[in-house]
Amino acid sequence: MRSLLNKIVLLLIVLLLTLSCIAGASAEDTDTPAKDLTNYLSIRQDEGHKDAYGRLKTDNLYDFVRYAAYETISLSWEKATERPAYLCIQWYTLPYHVELRQLDQNGTMLSEEPVGQTYDTVVSLSPETASVTIAPQRTGMSITRIALYSEGTLPPPFFPWKDTPHGMDYLVVATHPDDDTLFMGGIVPTYGAEQGYVGTIAYVTKPARLRVQEALLGAWEMGTVYYPLFLEFEDVFPIGLENHFLPEVVTLAFVRMLREYRPLVVVSHDLNGEYGHPQHKIVSASIVDACRLAADPTYDRSSYEQFGTWEVKKCYLHLYPENQFEMDMNKPLAAFGGRTALEVARDAFQKHRSQTGGAHYVHDETGLYPVNRLGMAYGTVDAGSDLFDNIDPTLFASYIPPESTPEPAPEQTQEPTSVPTQKPAVVPTAEPAPDPTPVPTQSSETKTGAKDILLPILYALIGAAIASVCFLLFRRRKRS
């Protein structure tokens, strides 16, 4: 009896240890931050960049290293204490025509792919990768930082962005980084993050690189998951508008953007420029013109031949006096743990640290520039009382068509006869073959699901073992 009890106790210990390992692994999969391995990074480049080694490893957005066309750099990590999983690159300017090559320890190329148009590039390294070559082509490149990380959750600003969709439900057009939070800050939290509509933000001007980083941090805070657009016009106020911010040039850029990315609804600035900012005025007037011209095949034949025309259904402007509706900015949003859209917009504005020391503030409905008040300045459908009212739901990027089910065939009835007929035999009909089940990929969700199944089983086994011990102890006591 004592031997049996010892075995059961040993089984309990094993089960408890297994349970703790599974729980620990589950927490590690979801909560473990990636380890910074940048100190192990070796950088090989031309002699003219001797000082670049230290500069590229620092988090200083005001400093960058410029590489000429076809001037490659090679990165490796021979002395790293663990396998790197991510190579992260922060560009000072958007990379154009840059190739990225992964090579194994023998120098054999494993992959070659172009770098996307993002300011922060995250490269997933294959297990066999021993080095990476960054190769600018025709236009060169400017890099401000390179970092190396292990498996895990990457720190800001290396967010898991999705590609900018070519087909959107909405597009917020902001003149500067921070304007999207100050004057249109309820759109992304309410319609994007909370209601699931597909869209992003377009920033018309590109001031300093720091402002770009603040824009990305603020956009992510508001719930944007699709990478924003940067049109890279110069930030000029007020001197220089006549040379660098002409309305016809801005309108042309907007038409090309609308035709390429095809938003159903566009939201932008007050026609009066909120507090009178001349660039805000040009942006709001130009986006209304662009919504109309994007559907005209005679305007800008180049973008028409490349993308075709596009019909924007609605264009809303901040504070526009006609066809107005007011957003509920004080409703708790489940996507943000109960925070309101107003709170989210204000938190997002705080990500623009270079701008928070001034007079700007996200105004509620009682303020001078209430963020919740919009009016439809252009539309091909009636305004209604909400952003997406009167738009055909099948046009939305997030629309999922219902599954078509075949209509049942009408039952055949026999004509009555004077002579009795035999009861027809029941012929079994074959059930339709089920659709093949796709093989699940080993994502983090499927891993978590497997653990969720194993944990109850282990709990049940532990409970059964405890019950067995109690029963045996009770029998021993009864016999004695």
Regions found by a protein language model. Name each.
Residues 29-68, 91-93, 104, 119-121, ...:
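The feature marks non-catalytic terminal segments
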Residues 11-20:
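Bacterial N-terminal signal peptides
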Residues 32-86, 90-300:
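Active-site beta-strand->loop->alpha-helix modules in alpha/beta enzyme cores, enriched
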Residues 19-29, 448-452, 473-476:
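Sec-dependent signal peptide cleavage junction
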Residues 459-480:
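C-terminal membrane-anchoring or membrane-association module
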Residues 1-9:
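Bacterial N-terminal signal peptides that target proteins for export
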Residues 436-449:
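Juxtamembrane low-complexity tails/linkers enriched in Ser/Thr-Pro and polybasic
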